[in-house]
Amino acid sequence: MTGRVCVLVMDSFGIGASLDAARYGDAGANTLVHIYEACKRGECDIDGVRKGPLMLPNLAGKGLYHAAMASSGLPFIDLSALAIPSGYYGYAVEQSLGKDTPSGHWEMAGVPVTFEWGYFPDKSYCFPEELISEFIKQCNLPGVLGEKHASGTIIIDELGEEHIRTGKPIVYTSADSVFQIAAHEEAFGLQRLYDICKIARNLVDKYQIGRVIARPFTGKPGSFKRTGNRKDYATPPPEKTLLDFLKEDGREVIAIGKIADIYAHQGVTQEIKADGNMALFDATLSAMKTAPQGSLVFTNFVDFDSSYGHRRDVAGYAHALEQFDVRLPELEALLQPDDMVFIAADHGCDPTFPGSDHTREHIPVLMFGPQVNSKFIGRRDCFADIGQSIAEHLQLSSPLTHGVSFL
């Protein structure tokens, strides 16, 4: 059993449009480069928070910019001015058919999603009538509000007051395979929201919907705010993932943030919840202080996606990247000789792109540790190469079905 592995998923941090991006309406998307260029133009200054060019010295030192240049071919930075990266660096291409959170995470853990998710059409009353009527009946509701594609923050501003007055939850979707339910934590009840989400999870299975998401909020009309009590009710992966194999082998699999939800709580030995990227980083550091040899610490940093990518907040995304970057030395200080850290993403969500949806992009693949030398691993043809490499390092008895190790 060799060392430990820590995986940091920078949710939505793509580094260049995939070759098939046009099929998804995402030709030209590049989350990193477009944020970098916006900062360079002075468009991401926030009084008292950040100013000027994007500053990611630690990620750059691990090969982020080298990987991004290889991914897109865009000469957005002079690589000759940078030091040789201190770790493995490259980029990966998604084989799954979607550009969503479960697809990216499952593929990373060795299970590409080769089937088509179900989606709801972008029109008024977008959900099947039988689904909504059965949902109302089984949940004993007076009705529902919304029933359309919408931004989660906008729809609670639009319908939150009516929701409180009528007791009708707000149901909506997006370009992802999701059925989302928003409700006020106090007026409707947080546990009640979770209960109706569980009912919805069973009802949407026949439509091949990837996730039911509880979207609780608080506040009063004009100042509603989503809380950190979100829960994702995902359909289980179709095959065993890296997490399952590790758990079966007696390893600790410590899921931080929404990781456990993404894998439908399968293959997880410990769940740690935290709200916000910095709290998630704190939880990761705490886990690494006590995680035993042979274990996996797996964290999803959701704010990049939910707070900045979807909301097309370029300056906020830039600031979040810099906050993440400055914490990396704290993690490095906790690494034992045989530990490895993997940094990746699950899809893109270019905040400069039209709309509010994910973008089909390559992801960065960065790996470092006390005994890891510098190496360009090039283009990886499947996110599962990450999982296969983790399996090899942790000396699992048998390799994953998908993916090629780059160790």
Curated annotation (Swiss-Prot):
It catalyses: 2-deoxy-alpha-D-ribose 1-phosphate = 2-deoxy-D-ribose 5-phosphate; alpha-D-ribose 1-phosphate = D-ribose 5-phosphate. Its EC number is 5.4.2.7. Coiled coil: none annotated. Binds 2 manganese ions. Mn(2+) 2 binds at residues 305, 310, 358. It is an enzyme of class 5 (isomerase). This is Phosphopentomutase. It comes from Legionella pneumophila (strain Paris). The gene is deoB.
